[in-house]
Amino acid sequence: MAQYTKAMGTVRKYTPATLKRDGKPAFVYVYRHLQTGQVAYTQVPGVTEHHLNRQFKDPNWENKRPTMRQDLWRPMAVADFGDHQAACDAYDGLVYLRYKRTHDGKKDIKGWRKTNAAGNVWQDGQYRPVYTQEALADLSTVTEAVKVPVTIHWEDLWRRGAAESWPENADHSVLKRWDAIYPQSLEKRLAKEAKVPGETTAEQ
């Protein structure tokens, strides 16, 4: 991660120690923007200016800096890593892979993406599905890399795709319908089932 940190500054807002101090579970949240399909990663519920500043450093017309309106962000997946260091490493890895795709590997990635007749990233209105697809590929990559059991809670199992395409250390479940509306309740509910024994979330 040193290359990313040097180029972009501090990636994570929370360290393993601060997450434990604040009673936060070892989660990584994967949010999708309802209008554009863009994805933001967070360590606690909700998308903030910090996340947008770090994860959309050099926006362009195909990948504009998304709005921070909370009603437009929905949790696509919540990954429980069961270990705060693993969760922080996974978060850093997700942001780093995004950075590599949009900077160092930009030309190569462009050739892999579905494009329209003009050679631009395919879209339906403002929505570009490629961003959620790439986010899921990156989540699979970091899940395998951390080498600890991971439970991924999905907004819908069809987003996960085929279970056999995921690493062996990944288990899967489905979020409840109201989790997208009440993110703080989502954190508390999932924390009760979290993998780290003896750790619970602090009361909000």
Curated annotation (Swiss-Prot):
It comes from the Eukaryota. Coiled coil: none annotated. It is found in: Nucleus; Mitochondrion. Pfam families: Mhr1. Its main location: nucleus. Keywords: Mitochondrion, Nucleus, Ribonucleoprotein, Ribosomal protein, Transcription, Transcription regulation. One of its GO terms (cellular component) is nucleus. Transcription factor involved in regulation of RNA polymerase II-dependent transcription. Also involved in regulation of mitochondrial DNA recombination, maintenance and repair, and generation of homoplasmic cells. This is Large ribosomal subunit protein mL67. It comes from Yarrowia lipolytica (strain CLIB 122 / E 150) (Yeast). The lineage of its organism: Eukaryota, Fungi, Dikarya, Ascomycota, Saccharomycotina.
